[in-house]
Amino acid sequence: MVNTCGFIGDAKEESINTILEYAAHRRSGDVRRLYVMGCLSERYRKELPAEIPEVDAWFGKMDWSGIVSDIARQFPATVPYDRIITTPRHHAYLKISEGCDRFCAFCAIPLITGRHHSRRPEEIVEEVRMLTERGVREFNVIAQDLSAYGRDLNSAKQSGLADLVNRIADVPGVDWIRLHYAYPADFPHDLLRVIADRPNVCNYLDIALQHISDPVLKAMRRHVCLLYTSDAADDG
């Protein structure tokens, strides 16, 4: 199973080289089956099968049911946990949403991941509980756009990020919460109060400002301006 990235040139090159390496093993019989998944497979799923026929199946970024059913048919097995941790056991990445609706001029993420959709808060909190029972103490909360979390889950289109972080912070055993990849436009300012009030929410916030020049921001389709960014920084 080769997991790929199709976002930047170096990552695409590394992904292709890895697929070709295992395609050679597939031809020689050293590998019984070869599957490819992830961003590259999602973005170029029409072109790649003809170029690399040794791959038995190509799966897009969200083809979870297809991956599971195909592998289960070929390799029946029992997996002891819903999630396998690949980081050091004390910390884990916690993805709370997938996709992006921003469509910045320079970014391919919406083409790869599709439109933004949030995970249900109950599902996320349950995953946190499961992971803390296995020894995880630090959670890196990630998404392509943290600022948009929850807007698709309520009719008022309001962010649910602050409430979600509070609920994660309430879970026994959670020592650190660190927030990654917020978008400056529509940033939920009530989150700043949560960061200030909760001792297990780190004084850390990853926001991609990208630029401060209004003409450049307009060309980039970033939907913010110098004044907005300055006001947001003052509020912080």
Ranges and model annotations:
Residues 192, 218-223:
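Gly/Pro-rich active-site loop or hairpin
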Residues 228-236:
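Single conserved hydrophobic/aromatic residue that forms the stacking wall/gate
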Residues 89-122, 236:
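Canonical Radical SAM [4Fe-4S] cluster-binding loop centered on the CxxxCxxC motif
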Residues 58, 63-94:
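N-terminal [4Fe-4S]-dependent radical SAM core
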Residues 2-66:
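Cofactor-cradling patches in redox/metallo enzymes
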Residues 12, 92, 113-201, 211-213, ...:
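Conserved Radical SAM active-site core
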